């Protein structure tokens, strides 16, 4: 779980899970093209955008969420930007599988018809499930449909995040 806004993440210790990021625009464009294809569609219809290990996504986040460097000579900052390290909580897969979340933070959610305890339990369950899923490869999407459209270029996660975070503190 990566929180770019607050420069922090929760990762499963010992697992550098592959994450697949596909923009809604790319998904729509692929579906439009695929509908017009001749022939038989594959039984499994994976559409896979950019695939990166979590460690690389965190590096991109640290780069994009950097801070202006004001003391170039002392810090050795030649590009005018310093990376801003993310705080990374590592949790054990065994703890997660036993329903224990040991991270220093969690997701936040609220709803006027749901009590705080119910929300907390639901958010914890979703976060644990997401982390277990990542460690077990659930976010490494297959690419059967990609192979039918070899000329299609998916949005790269770094380009997408750079656009989203440009000019934001």
PLM ranges: what are they?
Residues 1-70, 74-87:
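Oxidoreductase cofactor-interface core, primarily capturing Rossmann-like NAD(P)-dependent enzymes
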Residues 7-10, 138-142:
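Surface-exposed beta-strand-to-loop junctions
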Residues 17-18, 136-138:
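Short, surface-exposed beta-strand/loop "edge" segments at domain boundaries and coil↔beta transitions
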Residues 21, 125-126, 160:
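Tryptophan-centric aromatic hotspots in well-structured domains and transmembrane helices
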Residues 22, 52, 91, 114, ...:
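Short coil/turn linker and secondary-structure boundary residues
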Residues 34-35, 134, 164:
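Hydrophobic residues in alpha-helical segments
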Residues 58-137:
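Terminal hydrophobic/aromatic helix or amphipathic segment near a protein terminus
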Residues 142-169:
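Amphipathic terminal alpha-helices
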């Amino acid at each position: 779980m990566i929180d770019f806004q607050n420069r922090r993440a929760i990762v499963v210790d010992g697992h550098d899970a592959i994450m697949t990021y596909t923009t809604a625009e790319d998904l729509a464009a692929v579906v439009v093209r695929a509908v017009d294809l001749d022939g038989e569609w594959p039984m499994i219809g994976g559409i896979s955008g950019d695939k990166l290990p979590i460690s690389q996504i965190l590096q991109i986040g640290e780069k994009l969420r950097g801070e202006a460097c004001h003391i170039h000579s002392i810090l050795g900052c030649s590009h005018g930007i310093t990376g801003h390290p993310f705080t990374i909580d590592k949790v054990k897969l065994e703890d997660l599988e036993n329903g224990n979340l040991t991270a220093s933070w969690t997701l936040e959610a609220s709803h006027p018809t749901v009590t705080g305890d119910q929300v907390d339990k639901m958010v914890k369950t979703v976060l644990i499930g997401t982390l277990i899923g990542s460690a077990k490869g659930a976010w490494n999407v297959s690419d059967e449909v990609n192979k039918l459209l070899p000329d299609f270029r998916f949005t790269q996660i770094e380009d997408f995040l750079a656009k989203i975070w440009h000019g934001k503190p």
